[in-house]
Amino acid sequence: MPASTSTSLLTDMYELTMLDGALKDGTAHRRCTFELFGRRLPATRRFGVVAGTGRILEALERFEFDAEQIDWLRDQGIISEEAAQFLTTWRFSGDIWGYAEGECYFSGSPLLTVEGTFADCTLLETLLLSILNHDCAVASAASRMTIAAHGRPCMDMGARRAHERAAVSAARAAIIGGFQGTSDLEAAKRYGIRCIGTAAHAFTLLHDSERDAFDSQVAKLGAGTTLLVDTYDIRQGVINAVEAARAAGGELGAVRLDSGDLVAEAFKVRGQLDAMGATSTKITVTSDLDEYAIAALGAAPVDSYGVGTKLVTGSGVPTAALVYKVVQREDSNGETVLVAKKAESKSTVGGRKVAGRVLGEDGYATEELLLVGTSFEEGQALLAERGARPLQVQLVRGGQIDADAWGSEALSRAQERHLRARNELPYQAWRLSEGEAAIPTRYEKVG
């Protein structure tokens, strides 16, 4: 049976059982505020990168329960007839504020603030966490890799190392973190990302000789293509690659190294290319790279990097460990009550947060300021008084999605936004070693 285009069942069962219970006891329509945040950053991360909000808005557009889904939920005994009738006409009608995609975040940063009825807020929980926990982890890893690359382009080549759908979202998240292209055709088509790729070792092995394979590739892609030179002997591979390009009337664009001691081989290949007069031919390296391997290649004559497994799996941090908690609700008298979880190691701070980044006189960030218990309108003025840059934007108003917050143009803006946000962090943020967050988070209660 083909999968439904609706995103409403991409959720945990208890979201529906809570809805059913709340409908029965009359609390489903109480106004609530939920926040999505991380209690702390992973030990190896000095900052996080917001990615996935554009995908959330795309998914929210299709978040409704169709008749077949409702019948199945009822037949399974998951929902009652009352809940089934409610879901028939339900669509999210609340408000969502969030950090702009590409922004950096820290401990406690309210990446999303969802306001509406309890029914509105609870039904979205799993989908929001599923998307942001994955995409933020990948974008954060991508940012560390592009830091390590010091301006040399990084390309996503991880499609074969992830679930086919996860690979598409990972490619998008990698772009936000500073990557310049992807090998994944679906991601390139869907999000307007530059697509990259030439040939694998299998193409060389298919032909009777390496030179035959290179001649074929150059005939198809032109002399400016990238030729993989380590199928057999690297030294002879470089000779064959340069000669194949010149036989076609041009200079070779690049060679790719995918095995061996990449630092040593890069120096040898650069010397060989220069000796042959191929001074404009670039060197790209692949082979299970992560930010540490890229940093180790910093002094080598490498021009670009192709990253696969470590990128799409978050480079040791496969989830951003974000949570989604109610921070205030309406009581039986219609009054707003701040609520917080008090359990040790999993406590939360009650009340809506309005977030800003405080900058020092030198233009570098000094702290993440979270104003507690104020409205977004009042909070913006208070942030200005404190010299803090506002971090949240409205993504959904009364159920209406901001169309400018998703799509290929929004993705390009997110990448640019991330580079600006990262550049305003203190130098500690650029360290790859374990350590404290680049800036502290401070809560300030208002009123």
What is each residue range found by the language model?
Residues 78-92, 408-409, 425:
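Short, basic/aromatic beta-hairpin or loop at an interaction surface
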Residues 21-79, 147:
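Extended boundary segments
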Residues 256, 283-286:
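Extended hydrophobic secondary-structure segments that form protein cores and membrane-embedded regions
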Residues 1-30, 40-42, 84-93, 102-279, ...:
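Buried, small/hydrophobic-residue-enriched core segments of structured protein domains
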Residues 2-30, 44, 276, 281, ...:
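Gly/Ser/Thr/Ala-enriched C-terminal appendages of enzymes
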Residues 71-72, 140-144, 158, 430-437:
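Short coil/turn segments at secondary-structure boundaries
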Residues 57-63, 98-101, 105:
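An N-terminal, globular interaction/scaffold subdomain
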